[in-house]
Amino acid sequence: MKKHIASILFLFLLSTFQLIAQSHSVKRLGIEQGLSNNYVVSITQDKQGFLWFATEEGLNKFDGTRFTTYYKNDLAQNNQGITGNELNRVYADTKRPIIWIATQRDGLNAYNYNEQTFTAYQHNPENPHSLITNDVTDISPSTQHDDGLWISTYYRGIEYLDITSGQFTHYNKSTVPGLPCDQTWTVLDGGDGNLYIGHVGSGFSIFSPKDKSVKNFRNEAGNPMSLPGNDVFCIIKDANGNIWLGTNNGLALYDAANENFIMFKNNKNDKYATLCSRILSIRQLKDNRLWIASELNGIAILNLKQSMFLSPEEISLEYIQEGADSRSLSNASARCIFQDSFDNIWIGTWGGGINFISSKPPLFTTLSYSPIPNNENSLNNKVASSLCMDRQGRVWIGTDGGGINVFEGEKRIAIYKKESGNIPSNFILASLQDSKGNLWFGSYQGGISYYDNRNKKFRSISLMGQSNLDVRTIYEDTQHNIWVGYSGGIVILNPLTMEIIRHYNTENSELQSDFIRSITQDEKGRFWIGTFGDGLGIYTPDLQKIKTFTQRDGFCSNTVNQIIQDKQKRMWIGTGEGLVCFLSTDELNYKTYQRKDGLINTNICAIAEDKKGNIWFSNNKGISCYVTSKDCFYNYSHSDDVPAGSFSSSCVTQNKNGWIYFGSINGVCCFNPDITMNEQPAPAAVITEMKILGRLSNLENNDMIINLSKGQNVELSHAQNSFGLTFNVQNYSLVNQVEYVYMLKGLENSWYTVNENNSVTFRNIPPGKYEFLIKARVHNQEWPEEATSLTIRVNPPLWLTWWAKLIYIWVSISIIYLILHAYKKKLDLESLYTLEKKNHEQEQELNQERLRFYTLNSATLL
């Protein structure tokens, strides 16, 4: 009875899989980005945050920007490398700095990323405790012992590795007679004392290592409660303790209470037959959804958050299929699924490399062109030249040659073209939804088209008997009349009768130009009219000139692309050479914003105001926002997923939820301003590599990589005083949105911005102790207070060490002493010589006196 109740509760939790109306933005990484091979079979993440990918040729480490590859017999590795290139599985040890690698024919490898060394575990016929065979298919950590791993092999059953001793215990038909087969695809330690084993052609077994008991389940023809297929490729245990299996014949759920299986192969909503194909990987994500990877049928997603009962035949699914657009997989065969520590999803495909799905919604998404005619998620033309939103929330996109594309959400539901008789021209340059919900379209060489929202029909309107007019703007005034600006002036239409009320041009009015680009009426009833080549004009309702603004008067540009009035009654004018704001419509004083004020580009194409009063505008370098509360600009470019290339003039619309749409030469860029401007905590910068640069004169590359895994202190010799540092953030979803500043404290105590490549280079740094500091922030956010640091000590050469300097001082003192001693001795000798000389002179003088005395006495006596 308890088993029956448990089964009912289990099914209750399983029920009501909901279809999630969410599209996934998929980024692709492959051999072009440095991946060793596009056949990716397993993914894991180490304790330092780096991702590891096992492929059909080599092991790959990914730091967020660059791949480091590991091959068999790699000459770049100074120690023993990986034993094989053809891999099956990678697993990051949660207790140790080790990546475990299962190879197809070359045993088990353990890579210590702190020591950067490989340890190989291979079959040794002379050692009974070695790995029994080298064909390793899967790795599962032991839940009973921290020092244990369970290994499945293709030919010789299950192995248990005692990591401390390095010895293997063998579980196969020789040691466990109840095992149906030694060929295994996968093994899972369920944490309940049982191992769950997926066999090659022999179904699914539950094995108790303690008592060596085995239960085996296989497909039984005609039994819908049996295992759907006898090849079991993957097994997982979800958060509720349920066992899910991926087989060669679909997905199965093990009902432990009744010892049978729930199959999903008869699900009527499985339009791609994913759940009855070969299931190669199953992963439960943190949001309680199951992601199921299949061969040739992409990915199916089941939501486990349930509230009512549905049978397996009725559950709904979400799919990610192969396709050419950014919402599809690069290959229909998905081999593995992994969720990283930032909740991002990584998918390994068979031939399509890596597919990445961010946990965060993209700042900007693009409705882009696809050459595939029946692709409902894309435009039929590259250039979006006009935009408007109808009352049902559908976006009407006028294109430059493809007519009108209508989108509901991200799905194209209609195309209206000249060839189908709906519109007179496929080149749509202007559009408007009027106050009654009807749509107006202006075209190049096609005049005006009117779409009646009630009867869902188009009507062409001839202006002055001409149908080939170049219409650039359409506006509805406060009297609900329709103003049409074209290359011959302005036409005002009565929308009820479709008759022309008035036609204005430079000949019959005070208009300064016939080339009209934008029309807006302010709160005083005046009309602000922007032209191509003759600046801005302000007019009365009957187009009497009030004031004009041109370059001759100091206005920044004569080309006006769009004019809007915001909630504060300010007028914003997008020109070819700056953004102009009239703070008041009374005094007509204005301020011009240009590059010196923070604009990334001054060719302002289209303008919109969000719900918070911020002013958004497209330009030729991306999209910018004037943040009213901060009086500053936020700039977004291609690195933020804004389409590359120029944007279209006056091509903008908004939906009722506040989403803004800008048209460009590469599709429609849409975004939620609240999400785009949401404050994000600064990600921590990670120093990923330090490279000692070889001498520039050498033809060979003598650069040397320094291992930074052991700590944040590096000691270099005097000959290693030229080096480069590479850094990144480990959340790949932020990689293109992050900017960096750095400082080498001790050399220069100033912060410098990093321009590109996430790296800096220092050359000929003098001996000393330095601290390298690096900060990261998301574009337009604040810099953090804390920085990632690396202490670098450049040791002096032998002749500049402290003891060498001490010897130099001692020798110098000795030399000085000897010089002084010699000098003193010289002085003493000179003094003695002078004294002797003086004495000698005195003696000579005395002798001379004596001689004179004797001579004088002698003469006297004579």
Where are each of the predicted segments found?
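Conserved beta-propeller blade signature
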Residues: 50-52, 98-100, 148-150, 194-196, ...
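Loop/turn residues immediately N-terminal
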Residues: 57-60, 105-108, 155-158, 201-204, ...
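Helical H-box environment at the start of the DHp/HisKA dimerization domain of histidine kinases
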Residues: 854-862
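Sec-dependent N-terminal signal peptides
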Residues: 5-15
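Residue-level detector of Asp-centered blade-edge/turn motifs that repeat once per structural unit
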Residues: 45-48, 92-96, 141-146, 189-192, ...
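Residue-level "micro-hotspots" composed of small/polar
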Residues: 8-10, 20-45, 51, 71-88, ...
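Cytosolic signal-transmission helices at domain junctions
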Residues: 818-853
